Amino acid sequence: WVSCKSKEGLPEDISFSVNYLGANITQVGLNFSRPAAQILGQYYQFIRLGFQGYKEVQYNSLTIAKYIHDEIAKMEPFVNYSEEVVNPLFIWYMKPEYAKNAKWTLYDLQDKLSQHGWMVPAYTLPSKLDDYVVMRVVVRQGFSRDMADMLLGDIKNAITELEKLDYPTPTRMAQEKNLPVEAKVFNHGCKAHKAAK
């Protein structure tokens, strides 16, 4: 183990920062060995399910991801970043013409969804694409069609609620002024970090 009393003792080139769930999170990872529990768990699952079982699990996840992707595309404010879904995950962003008149941002939608227990992150893309604020859905094993319908219903309800706003949200005003957006995330007792744009 290596412990540093302050950030000054830690070289910047071994830290990794990512804008995730509305906050800049910095991690430092030096791993020279890994526990074997995950490998043993995967080995057990492979023996239990076999190739066909894994194929069915992945196919189910991909089918549900495509369903959510298609339903998001039907919603007026959004456009999917990619036309196709080749993995059980995808991102979308707000249509530029819609965003011009909207009183809310995807950060506000993230906040509304988190109030219903959904962890759907809104974040900026890496440099040269950092004008895009996107949201991401990852469909994991066990995420059912019923859960997908619940998520889509909560997204629609949140949009309806956000559309009723009389005034722009703080994140919308900050975005218009090109100011950093104050994060609204719970991060286990640490102070909230500021998110880019």
Region annotations inferred by a language model:
Residues D13-S15, N101, M147-M150:
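Short conserved micro-motifs at the rims of enzyme active sites and ligand-binding pockets
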Residues W1-N87, Y93-Y98:
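Active-site C-terminal subdomain of aminotransferase-like
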Residues L129-K197:
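PLP-dependent enzyme catalytic core of the Aspartate aminotransferase-like
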Residues Y67, E71-M75, D108-W118, D154-L165:
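Generic non-transmembrane alpha-helical segments
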Residues F78-M119, V139-Q141, R145, E182-A195:
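Conserved PLP-binding catalytic core of the aspartate aminotransferase-like
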Residues F32-P35, P126-D131:
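Short glycine/proline-enriched loop/turn "hinge" motifs that connect secondary-structure elements
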